[in-house]
Design a protein with these regions (language model features):
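C-terminal cap of metal-dependent C-N hydrolases
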Residues: 331-335, 341, 390-458
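Short catalytic-loop micro-motif centered on adjacent basic/acidic residues
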Residues: 93-94, 124-127, 242-247
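A glycine-rich helix N-cap at a beta->alpha junction
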Residues: 113-129
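Metal-associated gating/positioning segment near the N- to mid-region
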Residues: 50-118
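Divalent metal-coordination and catalytic microenvironments
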Residues: 12, 30, 52, 63, ...
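Histidine-rich, glycine-flanked metal-binding segment
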Residues: 1-57
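His/Asp/Glu-enriched, well-ordered alpha-helical/loop segment
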Residues: 214-240, 289, 311, 315-317, ...
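Histidine/acidic residue-rich metal-binding segments in metalloenzymes
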Residues: 135-317
Length: 493
């Protein structure tokens, strides 16, 4: 008799935001078709013994930057999705900081094609508001953008083309972007820092001849972030768009977001492991290797972020994976202004948060909510992604809660892995046994085995009748083979 299931995951404990349960998972054609009491599943082609393991939904990392096509040596969709899979991420939502900027329907289509040809797991794409042309924004939404992203600060010197249509510093432009994005029905994710204040504080540091890591901290203080959140909230009170404050860092920003939420505004927020586990002390110790915008804050701010998560003011945790190679970062010890801001963190979110949970500091169910379910809901992909339930994609992480691993330089898969310094030597409880994307095993025993080009481009569930997942073009197999050959020749995982 032909097996009814393609895959059965048996004997494990599934972990969802609502709680834990001893349930077996049945998978057919890439989707979960059954959650059954132990021993009650029909026959399957493959059965995975998950006794003693936790079964989690794959992470939906909703803040990731791929550097291709202009800087593939830092990261492309091949290496970036390999790194993601190694960290338990099964869906990436990629925010535009690339050249050409993802601010037109044409570039969005090119970026989707690039992702389809290289990705090992599923990828969704943000678009930028561009030149604030209503028909173009509507076209990008109809093509499958998961959301729009803007930055309230200006483009870094020399990177203007990558930020074109993304960096909007004037209130009138932010207001117009809010109006236009509201009409698409999508979310607007916003980097909240005020450029005028950044200019003031940077000028003071330059005038004093300051160029060390502490100068960067002083150049982007909490007030710059708080003013950005306040401006966004005040403008949006008149517009009524759905807005999401990304990589929030400070107690003051949490307070402001909570205030706007209490007034009924559709404002949500995100933070990242960099701010939950790092502080100003780390910025001084690791210098350019943890230079991020906004910068790392005080331990009091860190505590406020955890409180904001527990109380619901902050909805999601994402990596803000923004890779630069180690050689690009190192000159920042003598001149912090000369190096880019960003950490290659897509492989760190799961291990750091699972460790926190397995040590009893936070509930693992909450971690699942913050990293999988909430981002899937927020970006409108929760029908297929982020959940362990019937009908969802079989995106699974099998985690051994009794194992412990030390984070070492050889662990990481990003092309910019040599810039990861701040977590080396850290011991984390919980070790990934395997990761599954749509019912296919993509990691095993620490190796990434998912092939380049197997990933799909995910679009909002609202487009499910037309293009919920954009399938590869007819020539995708050739592109996939070429990408795999290149990865092998470069020694990629």
């Amino acid at each position: 008799m032909r097996p009814e299931l393609d895959l059965a995951v048996t004997g494990g404990t599934i972990v969802r935001g609502e709680g834990r349960a001893a349930l077996d998972i049945g998978v057919h054609e890439g989707r979960i078709v059954a959650l059954a009491e132990p021993g009650r599943l029909p026959s399957a082609r493959e059965t995975v013994d998950a006794r003693g393991l936790l079964v989690l939904p794959g992470i939906v990392d909703s803040h990731f930057h791929c550097r291709a096509p202009d800087h593939p040596e830092r990261e492309d969709f091949d290496s970036g999705t390999a790194a993601a899979a190694a960290g338990g991420v099964t869906t990436l939502l990629e925010m535009p900081i690339s050249d050409p900027a993802c601010a037109t329907p044409e570039v969005l289509a090119q970026r989707m094609a690039l992702a389809r040809s290289q990705a090992r797991i599923d990828v969704g794409l943000f678009a930028a508001p561009g030149d604030l042309d209503a028909p173009r924004l509507q076209e990008m939404a109809a093509a499958g953008a998961v959301a729009f992203k803007l930055m309230m600060h200006g483009a870094p010197p020399g990177r203007e083309s990558s930020f074109r249509g993304l960096a909007l510093t004037e209130n009138r432009d932010v207001y117009r972007a809010l109006e236009l994005v509201r009409e698409t029905g999508l979310l607007l994710a916003v980097h909240c820092e005020d450029q005028g204040l950044i200019d003031l504080f940077e000028a003071r540091e330059h005038a004093a001849g300051a160029a060390g890591p502490a100068a960067h901290l002083r150049s982007r203080p909490v007030v710059a972030e708080a003013l950005g959140v306040a401006r966004l909230g005040a403008l949006n009170e008149a517009v009524g768009a759905r807005v999401h404050v990304v990589h929030m860092t400070s107690a003051r920003a949490v307070e402001y977001v909570r205030w706007f939420q209490a007034r009924g505004q559709a404002m949500s927020a995100e933070t990242t492991p960099a701010y939950l586990f790092g502080s100003e002390d780390d910025a001084l110790r690791f210098g350019p290797f943890v230079k991020v915008n906004p910068p790392l804050r005080t331990l009091d701010d860190q505590a406020a972020l955890w409180q904001g998560l527990r109380q619901g003011a902050i909805a999601t945790i994402a990596s803000d994976h923004a890779p630069f190679r180690g050689a690009e970062k190192a000159p920042g010890w003598s001149d912090i202004w000369a190096v880019g801001a960003g950490i290659p963190g897509v492989e760190l979110t799961g291990p750091l948060l699972w460790d926190e949970a397995l040590r009893g500091r936070v509930a693992l169910e909450q971690v699942v909510r913050w990293t999988s379910e909430a981002p899937a809901d927020l970006y409108g992909i929760g029908r297929r992604k982020g959940y362990l339930r019937e009908g969802a994609d079989a995106d699974l992480v099998l985690l051994d809660p009794e194992a412990e691993r030390e984070l070492t330089a050889t662990d990481f898969h990003s092309r910019s892995a040599d810039a990861i310094r701040h977590v080396l030597g850290r011991r984390c409880r919980g070790a990934i046994v395997s990761v599954w994307s749509r019912g296919e095993r993509v990691t095993e025993a620490g190796r990434v085995i998912g092939t380049p080009g197997r990933g799909r481009v995910v679009v909002p569930d609202a487009l499910a009748g037309t293009a919920a997942v954009l399938e590869p073009e007819p020539n995708a197999s050739a592109a996939r083979a070429e990408s795999a050959a290149r990865a092998e020749s470069e020694g990629a995982p």
